[in-house]
């Protein structure tokens, strides 16, 4: 892929990124597989996700400045994340991208990075999750 943008954050922009995260968490809040592993109030979760994605996409290091190194896998280990939940998470993100009109190379780039990250967070099989 011939990226036609410098920092992905610049291509998306703060406003669209904020809309994407808010729309994403609206979907997460009502998803039967995801709702049980997220807090009922997603305000702080969305705020941290905005900070993280800003930094992850080449913007200011907002997440690290407030929370330290992201250590994503370690921070997600307490939650039962299965391949099925990773798929659900990615589906919510695709829906959010559709809703806010994120398209083209930047969408492909971001979704590709998020897909790798979601797969890396998987820490249980579906069988282990059902037996918990």
From Swiss-Prot:
Pfam family, any one: Bac_globin
The keyword Metal-binding is annotated on this UniProt entry: yes
Superkingdom to which the source organism belongs: Bacteria
Co-factor remark: Binds 1 heme group per subunit.
Cofactor: heme
Annotated signal sequence range: none
GO MF term set: heme binding; metal ion binding; oxygen binding; oxygen carrier activity
PANTHER family xrefs: TWO-ON-TWO HEMOGLOBIN-3
Function text: Hemoglobin-like protein that exhibits a low peroxidase activity. Its very high oxygen affinity may rule out the possibility that it is involved in oxygen transport.
Subunit structure: Monomer.
Protein name (record): Group 2 truncated hemoglobin YjbI
Organism: Bacillus subtilis (strain 168)
């Amino acid at each position: 892929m011939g990226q036609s943008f410098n920092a992905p954050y610049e291509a998306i922009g703060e406003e669209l990124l904020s809309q994407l995260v808010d729309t994403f968490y609206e979907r997460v809040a009502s998803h039967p597989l995801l709702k049980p592993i997220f807090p009922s109030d997603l305000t702080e979760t969305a705020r941290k996700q905005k900070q993280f994605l800003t930094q992850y996409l080449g913007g200011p290091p907002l997440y690290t400045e407030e929370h330290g190194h992201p250590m994503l896998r370690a921070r997600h280990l307490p939650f039962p994340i299965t391949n099925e939940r990773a798929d659900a998470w990615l589906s919510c993100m695709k829906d959010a991208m559709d809703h806010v009109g994120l398209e083209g190379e930047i969408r492909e780039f971001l979704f590709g990075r998020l897909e790798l990250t979601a797969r890396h967070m998987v820490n249980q099989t579906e069988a282990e999750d059902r037996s918990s």
